[in-house]
Design a protein with these regions (language model features):
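Boundary at the C-terminal end of the N-terminal hydrophobic targeting segment
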Residues: 19-25
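Second-shell loop/turn segments in exported
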Residues: 116-117, 126-135
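A contiguous strand-loop segment
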Residues: 25-124, 144-313
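N-terminal start-of-chain detector that recognizes signal peptides
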Residues: 15, 75-77, 134-135
Length: 313
């Protein structure tokens, strides 16, 4: 009887995982120009899903008449979400890249469930593919993503986006702000977010766990963020320290054994393979090199306090 109970529990767990075709198993690797052999920015995008990525979406460049609209269809569920105004010109896209060599990919991490917005139009997939048709550079893409979410609401869970063009590569963590209805409208529309430029010569990886921790508050060349990313966390009771100590991941997607062992461990594995077992990174103006094994207790869930660096070389 005990054996049967174990088998039933295992089958239930498998069903729970496969009920979501994405199964929370995406991995991105971002390689900057100085870290690649041909001086190219590179983004890899993998998902352990048998029902996704069997196609490449193609949209030709197009000019649109004034007053044209765009139907927003949820990328995961295919549910119609609503319509938004179309722009005058859209760029040609193939898969997750457009004609200007802008690339956007993602991994989902969920985060605090109370921050989901059930009234919103723009899901994470629509943000990616609409932005690819409207932006030419990574910086433009970040702004378009933010503007779309702020205008039409963000309809998905916490996400990390990989964003790169020919010159720059960025990582962007974001999560919605929940629902607070007033006069039939959500007055918390949009999301809180941080985007960090990956230094040239470095690589970055994320795998269904928010990766940005503390970040520079006065370096717009290399770090952009929502004006309320810290104040909103204070308001919700997620953070009560000094601004300079604010940790996005800790506030909006606290790490636990499951997320570290099943998610950050994949990012660690990418670092370990690509950096030959040695992590070199900058901390407080100093260059630090340490073995990948220094984070073994972290990625096995034994010590959640010793987080990995965001970028390594």
């Amino acid at each position: 009887m005990a054996r049967h109970s174990t088998i039933y529990a295992l089958l239930a767990a498998i069903c729970a995982l496969t009920a979501n075709p994405r199964a929370e198993a995406c991995t991105n690797i971002i390689v900057t120009r100085g870290a690649s052999t041909d001086n190219s920015n590179i983004i890899s995008y993998a998902a352990d899903s048998h029902v996704l990525y069997g196609e490449l979406y193609f949209h030709p460049a197009a000019n649109w008449k004034a007053g044209s609209t765009l139907d927003i269809i949820n990328w995961d569920s295919y549910k119609p979400m609503g319509q938004i105004p179309q722009v005058a010109h859209t760029y040609k896209t193939v898969g997750n890249m457009n004609e200007h060599q802008l690339i956007i990919a993602e991994t989902t991490w969920g985060g605090r469930l109370e921050l989901e917005d059930t009234t919103a139009i723009m899901d994470y997939g629509s943000l990616i593919y609409v932005t690819l048709q409207r932006a030419r550079t990574a910086r433009e893409a970040i702004q378009v993503i933010v503007d779309l979410a702020n205008e039409y609401g963000y309809a998905s869970e916490g996400e990390t986006f990989s964003i790169a063009d020919k010159d720059e590569a960025w990582i962007m963590d974001l999560i919605g702000k929940g629902c607070e209805m007033k006069d039939g409208k959500n007055i918390r529309k949009g999301f809180v977010w941080v985007a960090r430029r990956i230094p040239d010569g470095y690589i970055c990886s994320h795998a269904n766990q928010a990766r940005i921790q503390t970040f520079p508050l006065n370096d717009p060349e290399n770090c952009l963020y929502a004006p309320d990313v810290i104040s909103f966390a204070r308001e919700k009771g997620y953070f009560d320290g000094k601004d300079e100590d604010f940790d996005f991941s800790a506030a909006y997607c606290p790490a636990d054994f499951g997320t570290v062992r099943g998610c950050d461990a994949r990012a660690w594995s990418a670092f370990n393979i690509l950096c030959d077992g040695q992590f070199t990174y900058e901390l407080d103006g100093k260059t630090i090199t340490e073995p990948a094994s220094a984070y073994h207790d972290y990625i096995t869930g034994k010590d959640l306090s010793h987080r990995m660096p965001l970028f390594v070389k």
